[in-house]
């Protein structure tokens, strides 16, 4: 009888151990499933304020920016007022697919946007052009987002930033005579991308990337078309 009791105890202990391992395994799987998806940055609204390099007598009342798409054509002109020292640009949430541009120039197709190669050749894009500022009917200048003050050389890793809409995620790789692509992945919707210049005197190409040092960026008056007489 003593042997039977001991055998029964061993069986119960083994069962409990196996049950515990199963519970732990389920718990681990649940924890893995509960991990949140990485946050996708939202660039659908651009807020411009604290514009640098503006002369005291420089005034404007709005910004206009063209969106290019299919065959490099302008598919929309966006207009936003300059009010209370800032511009709030709410970008279109979507575009008709037939108005969008091919993502890259594979097979020598110059109608495509990027010189790098997309991992999804069916992706389509639309791109913001220059941010021109107006005072009434007169175009008085251009503003830009970068970490370059506009003084001296734009080399030494100056970052020049633009915005692009994508109809699906894609990743760019490759290089051409002037640019190379690294850490250049786009999400569905609006994205920020940068051209980062090499150091002065360097033989490196300009880096194109979506890994942008945003904390270093600021808006500035890049060009003024108003001349004091």
Where are these regions (language model features)?
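Sec-dependent bacterial lipoprotein signal peptides
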Residues: 1-24
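Bacterial Sec-dependent N-terminal signal peptides
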Residues: 20-47
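Glycine-centered loop-to-beta-strand initiation motif
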Residues: 44-50, 63, 76-96
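Short, ordered, surface-exposed loop/turn motifs in non-cytosolic proteins
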Residues: 54-71
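Short beta-strand and strand-turn-strand segments in soluble, beta-rich domains
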Residues: 69-76, 175-178
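Short, exposed beta-strand/loop patches in secreted or surface proteins that constitute
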Residues: 77-81, 132, 183-184
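Long, low-complexity intrinsically disordered regions in eukaryotic proteins
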Residues: 94-168
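Extracytoplasmic cysteine-anchoring/structural motifs
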Residues: 154-229
């Amino acid at each position: 009888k003593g042997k039977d009791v001991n055998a029964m105890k061993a069986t119960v202990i083994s069962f409990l151990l196996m049950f515990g391992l199963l519970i732990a395994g389920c718990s681990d799987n649940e924890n893995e499933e509960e991990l949140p998806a990485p946050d996708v940055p939202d660039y659908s609204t651009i807020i411009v304020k604290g514009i640098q390099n503006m002369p005291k007598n420089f005034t404007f009342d709005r910004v206009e920016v063209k969106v290019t798409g299919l065959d490099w054509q302008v598919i929309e002109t966006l207009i936003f007022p300059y009010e209370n020292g800032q511009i709030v640009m709410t970008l279109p949430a979507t575009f008709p697919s037939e108005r969008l541009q091919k993502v890259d120039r594979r097979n020598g197709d110059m109608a495509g946007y990027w010189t790098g190669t997309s991992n999804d050749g069916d992706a389509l894009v639309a791109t913001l052009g220059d941010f021109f500022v107006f005072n009434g009917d007169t175009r008085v200048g251009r503003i830009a987002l970068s970490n370059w003050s506009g003084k001296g050389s734009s080399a030494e890793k100056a970052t020049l930033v633009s915005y692009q809409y994508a109809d699906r995620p894609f990743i760019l790789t490759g290089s051409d005579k002037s640019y190379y692509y690294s850490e250049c992945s786009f999400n569905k919707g609006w994205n920020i991308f940068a051209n980062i210049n090499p150091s002065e005197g360097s033989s490196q190409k300009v880096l194109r990337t979506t890994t942008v040092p945003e904390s270093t960026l600021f808006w500035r008056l890049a060009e003024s078309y108003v001349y004091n007489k």
